[in-house]
Amino acid sequence: MTQDKKMVSVVMCTYNGGKYIKEQLDSIVRQTYLPCEIIIQDDGSTDDTMDIVRQYAKQYPIIRITQNELGKGINNNFFSAIRKAQGEYVAISDQDDIWKLDKIEVMLQAIGDKMMCVGRSVPFYDEGDKRVNVHYDERKPNCNIVRMMYASMPGHCTLFRRELLEHLPSHLETRPIYTHTWYDVILGQTAAALDSIVLLDRVITMQRRHVDAASYKDVDTKRLRGMGNGAYIVWWGIKNYHRVKPLMAKHFSVRGGFLESIQSDAPIYKDAVRLMRCESKQGLWAFLGLVRWYVKYRHVMFYTYENDPVALVRAVLNPFMQVYNYRYLLNKK
């Protein structure tokens, strides 16, 4: 692959990232396939972040720096930075991760004619001088639109065509989805709605997580596979269905509304729209509709491919299992 064939813009949004940003920038400027530009947009850092990136910009002219006069917040900051990209492809960078040195090269090779390529990341955290890996699921994930309505692919794992922005609905900033979720969820669901995501099943990013965030180290042991855990999740879902389901209906109403605003001819997209309409309602008919769609897409709607009869059993019980997955909505009431 020659360097002049495809132009890639790297977009990084920063805020008080001075502690780790050097490692990330080093991993980008040392890529085997160099980007045409590195757009760094700062949202009002009060530490030494800007001093560091200015030093790098002197050494690497491909770095373009913008500092917001007023804080934009995550979505406004990322979308405004992405829209400045001049490359045919865009790669999102967090300020504290570490990229594999061939990340851009292998993702360009993998994307083909798709809108988005998604790779894998390994989470880690620093403990003194030690670098400790965090548990993560090594199974190959599904990334079709049915699955993506319940999950997301982190921005730092993606490379996408700038053309993808043209498929976002007009006046995106005024739509409920914009304050409901993050930019990478919006981009991922848009690409999935077009049935245009390819999975690169290899690690391309080391994702730094922070030791003071307990949720990053602790594993919900009830989510680990096993008959006992499965029975507990179903029992919890049945017991709390009446409390959580109304909140889930509101949640999926926003996601479903966004999905319907995307123009796509993909057959799976049309079924995903119907599925979200069932998720957005309550009552027996909506429940039965959910079971129907879960059964139809039982092999591809869970994290990874599942064989029968396990997939069939999970599909039938999934309305209750989903209640457990969305129990966090109780804390947002």
Q: Which residue ranges define each predicted feature?
A:
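C-terminal subregions of glycosyltransferases and related glycan-biosynthesis enzymes
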Residues: T174-W182, I186, M206-K333
